[in-house]
A protein has these predicted regions:
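Signal peptide processing junction and immediate N-terminal pro/mature segment
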Residues: 23-35
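A generic secondary-structure boundary signal that marks alpha-helix termini
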Residues: 19-20, 61
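N-terminal secretory signal peptides and thylakoid transit peptides that target proteins
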Residues: 1-19, 28
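Active-/binding-site microenvironments in catalytic and ligand-binding cores
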Residues: 34-342
């Protein structure tokens, strides 16, 4: 993979394209029944003033949001979708050159402790050797899940949790990744590139709520509560070809599109882009509002950098989705490798 220029240069390029998006949620270090869906918010700014999006419909103590929709019945229904036994890896390979939202990066260091110059461990008669490894980096690199503590509105996160009450440098004390149950559910894929009759949408290209609805109707995609909705834009094809461009802009949805998807009561919304939303933002002073709608207001998880290419090549629009989250206590996001099965 082509190496991305220095993190400082990459940050500058991304910030120009994103209209100052880096000033959003990463600027500071502290950072079985289905009830009816809550009314859509009129906008994140108004919601921040009204505070009418909490407590959660699952109660004031809830920490898992839309994961409450993962009932045993839902899981059993989803398992029936695995008819051929074919699996698809939806995660991408991550290394120190993977483009990521600035200033994120990740690096793997491999070592052979106390084995310099061909020495073996403890002078063992069977000459045992081993390698160990260490990861240094951020959890928001590559294919990732955004947990409910990842992004909020004016310091308030899902279910009214205030940052000063639960965000610690050692990890969040509520809404952590470790609280999320395994995802075993139905997923649907909406091919937005095919809807636009192009192999790939452009950076900053907005897919409106009406277009989402039309694409789903065209492709006979129906979302049921607890599903994972996956959006294919073709953007991931740039990650090797042009990593700088890939990481500095992207096609996607906006707040209105997020509100439409939230009205369908999915478990999660994902895409083959690094942020799901269209970047640069139409208004550089209104940033990541779709994240606010999904995560903070509705408790719906976000999945980024999903590798949808093989699914699209095979014409798959409905499949079993399986994901076991990394159990890092107090983390707000995590590098993942979901599996699609049909």
């Amino acid at each position: 993979m082509q190496r991305v220029p220095s993190r400082r240069a990459f940050l500058g390029a991304a910030c120009v394209a994103c209209g100052g998006a880096h000033l959003g949620f990463h600027a500071t270090p502290v950072q079985a029944q289905q009830p009816p869906a809550p009314p859509a918010a009129a906008g994140a700014a108004a919601a921040a003033r009204r505070r009418d999006w909490f407590p959660s419909r699952w109660g004031p103590q809830d920490e898992i949001g839309a994961a409450n929709l993962l009932t045993p019945q839902k899981v059993l229904e989803a398992i029936r979708l695995a008819r051929e036994g074919k699996t698809y890896r939806l995660g991408i390979v991550v290394d120190r050159n993977t483009p990521a939202f600035p200033p994120r990066s990740v690096a793997v260091t491999v070592m052979m402790p106390d084995q310099f110059g061909g020495a073996v461990v403890g002078e063992s008669e069977n000459r045992m050797s081993y390698c160990d490894d260490m990861v240094t980096g951020w959890f928001g690199v590559g294919t990732q899940i955004d947990g409910l503590a990842h992004l909020g509105i004016d310091g308030v996160f899902y279910n009214g949790n205030k940052a000063q009450d639960f965000v610690r440098t050692t990890g969040v004390t509520r809404l952590g990744i470790e609280k999320i149950p395994p995802f075993v559910t139905r997923a649907v894929l909406v091919d937005l590139a095919r809807f636009r009759n192009r192999p790939r949408l452009d950076g900053g290209e907005l897919v409106t709520a009406d277009e989402l609805r039309a694409a789903m109707q065209q492709q006979n995609v129906r979302v049921t509560p607890g599903d994972v909705v996956v959006l294919h834009t073709g953007w991931l094809s740039l990650i090797e070809q042009d990593p700088r461009r890939f990481g500095s802009e992207e096609p996607g949805i906006d707040a209105a599109g997020a509100e439409y998807l939230a009205s369908l009561q999915p478990l999660a919304v994902g895409a083959d882009t690094w942020g799901v939303e269209a970047v640069p933002f139409k208004n550089p002073k209104v940033i990541w509002q779709g994240h606010q709608v999904l995560l903070a207001q509705n408790g719906i998880y976000i999945l980024e950098n999903l590798d949808t290419r093989e699914l699209v090549r095979d014409g798959v629009t409905e499949f079993l989705f399986v994901l076991g989250q990394p159990l890092y206590r107090g983390a707000v996001q995590g590098i993942i490798n979901p599996v699609a099965i049909r």
